[in-house]
């Protein structure tokens, strides 16, 4: 049978399930897949397949995650589910799973638990702005008032982390019953997905964002000038556009792109995802280097000091064997290069153990083009020992 071609007729949205262990994230994922598949008369992804998540490597870190896809009437979704708590943390911090929104699963039998809180905080830190709540296992709670109490608790918890707790949609039901085909619960899953369709907005396309390209390599073409090559991170670049070279130096240099090449062919326009070479007017070979970025003028600045949410690899994952303290000086790998920085731990945190997730302050020795939400890795002698997301720019 010929392989199906992916026809892009509906807008694409990335979502995931988050919440405490055993509250039913994977069961809900399987139920959504089944209910939507049956509506369209196609085969669903079953529970065992989702639960047996394959290992992936992202930025040198091994993560177990399942990706499944499904469609509603108006959208195409890629849905991410991770089996273990550590997998969630790593997923969100490394950006392996970019989520446009998420379904927070809370068991009505338990109410919010420690990881419920952690996942809400993580979503806030890494920029997942839209959450829809699914109160699961409501069939196991006899007292309707208890379910309402749990809902209130969840709403308060969301508000505590600056989500609109009073306005976030909360859907109640049983993922397991829906998976078993209970008609009433199938309707609940349909209602949940209608809510996700309407509440989680369509993401802004990468091509609509301001142009940014981390520089991977620089070379000279005799008689033509300096070429910077790399993968366009976002936005669109057209020949003749003025751009800035930002990072590693205090001053920002302006230049004009006089030519764009991809696979040895000349292009008029490059867009997010393209690997290109950009010919830069009036730039000497020594005025630009790997680790800088080409960017739309005024869209990104250099910074040295910021706060970050960081996951520190455990010894088993190939990370450090010993804890680190304030004044730890590893390299921070941003865009395409390592820059040394000094770590300052928050008050009351004496040390950070391998396997910990922590927020701390970093001061780099050279300025780097940084913005909130940027992902980086922490390295020692070329080995990855952690991964982080910039949560707040300080200087």
UniProtKB/Swiss-Prot annotation:
Span list, region G5: 174-176
Chain positions covered by the region annotation G4: 136-139
Sequence segments annotated as region (G2): 60-64
Residue numbers spanned by region G3: 81-84
Domain tr-type G: 10-204
Catalytic activity annotation: GTP + H2O = GDP + phosphate + H(+)
Spans through the membrane: none
Region described as G1: spans on this chain: 19-26
PROSITE patterns per the UniProt record, alphabetical: G_TR_1 (PS00301), G_TR_2 (PS51722)
Protein residues bound to GTP: 19-26, 81-85, 136-139
Superkingdom of origin: Bacteria
Oligomer status and interactors: Monomer.
Role noted for this protein: GTP hydrolase that promotes the GTP-dependent binding of aminoacyl-tRNA to the A-site of ribosomes during protein biosynthesis.
Membership in a protein family: Belongs to the TRAFAC class translation factor GTPase superfamily. Classic translation factor GTPase family. EF-Tu/EF-1A subfamily.
Protein name: Elongation factor Tu
Lineage of the organism: Bacteria, Bacillati, Bacillota, Bacilli, Lactobacillales
Gene symbol of the encoding locus: tuf
